[in-house]
Each structure stands twice: as structure tokens, then as C-alpha cells.
């Protein structure tokens, strides 16, 4: 198939009730600290990042991992002066500055390690990251930050579920690109699409599934995570997916320059 492994890892310890317990176990084991301001792992800790870097480097080498989804960074700055990081400054910027510098160093050394083996590495940063193009020196994609994993617009009554989902995501793009005017290339956006899974509670005909996939491809992103439940797929949907991926790859040199024109989709405006 020509495929390789990827790794989905939450630096802060995930997003569940177990997150504080993970952080406490890491602190008890001497491998990092609990950030009591956000009740998760302190992602600015020097010892934690040293241990994490070793784990990621060793794991990427052993399993030839070429994709890293690093999901969840700093929800709140850690203000504990007893930890192995600095604190203070306006809006806790001393901590924030040192924390991100340590992450930049981690990204740099991790890429150098993979380069020695002539291996590529796609790094995807998700939650609690400023979506600045500056990050693209070190990572490949950044999550939108302004949306839910999945959502449905309520701009029209009794509209098809697929249209509500498409409009929701497009309205988040409008907010990102137009309202907030974030100067971020479409090709490097991670948008959570396509989602067609059991927990999403969506049900599309083959025609709707095709519309959903190709519409998403036209947003211009270079990277898709396929959140698909196999039991919801039939032979036609698998063929549609394959056709979309081939088309998206063949036309990426055009699609990567996608721009949003028109008004806010959630306000029933014409757009493209």
C-alpha cells in the first residue's frame, strides 16, 4: 500500500477526566510536573520535554513514523516557580517564551534525526496553538483553532445534514480568513475533515458523501485525516474516496492556492 505509521500523542495528557491523573503520575515518577493552573501536564517542563523528545525520536526510528499529530499544548501558563521553567512577565510571557523555545528545539532535533535516515516527517499541531505562518518553519500544519471537531450550521431549516456540515466548516474558514484575517496558507490548515464516523452521527447517501469529500478537497489543504468508520462505508463510498484522493493529489498545485470569496456562509451569503 505504500503506507507508513503515524502517531497521535497529546502533550498535555489528552482531554478527559483522566488528564489530571496522567499528570500526577508523571510528576510522581519524576518525569515532569502537574500544571495545577490547568490540571494537566506542564508542557514547559524541561525534564518532561527531554523525556518526550527521547520517546518520540526512538519511536519514530523504530517504527518508521512519518506523521506526528501533537494534540493539545498549553491551555494555561504554569505559574509554579518550583518547576524547571521560568515564570512571570506580563500575561506569563516568560513561561510562554521559554516553553515554545523548548518545543522549537524539540521539533528541530526530531527532524534532524529523521533526516539522517532520509525519512520525511509531517508534524501537525492542534489545540492551543496560535495559527501563525511563523510556525511553518518547524511544523507542516496547524489546526484552525476556532471550531469544533464537527458542527452543523443552523442557517436554514430542514436543510440536508451534509449541507449543514459543509456550511459550518466553511463559516469557520470565513471567520479564520476574513473576520480574523489570519494570514495563513490554506494548504497548511488542518480542519478535521473528512469525518464520517459512528460518533459523529452522520448518515450520507453515496451522492452526498461524494459532495462532502470533493467540497472539502477544494478548501486547499494538503493534508487529510480520514475519520471514517468502516461499517459506514460501502464499495461505492470506498471508490468515491479513492477517486477524490487521486483528484486532490493531482490538482494540489492549483487547490493549494484556494481563496474564500463572498460573505459569511452561516449568514446565507453567496460564497465560493
Q: Which ranges hold each PLM region?
A:
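Loop/turn elements at helix/coil->beta-strand transitions in domains of secreted/extracellular proteins
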Residues: 2-5, 63-66, 118-121
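Active-site groove signature of glycoside hydrolases
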Residues: 53-86
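Glycine-rich tight-turn/loop motif centered on a GG-T
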Residues: 1, 84-99
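Glycan-recognition surfaces
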Residues: 14-50, 54, 100-232
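Contiguous C-terminal substrate-recognition/catalytic subdomains in enzyme active sites
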Residues: 231-239
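Generic structural signal for hydrophobic
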Residues: 1, 59-60, 216
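Carbohydrate-binding surface patches
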Residues: 261-272
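Hydrophobic faces of well-ordered beta-strands that scaffold small-molecule active sites
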Residues: 5-9, 68-70, 123-125, 223-226
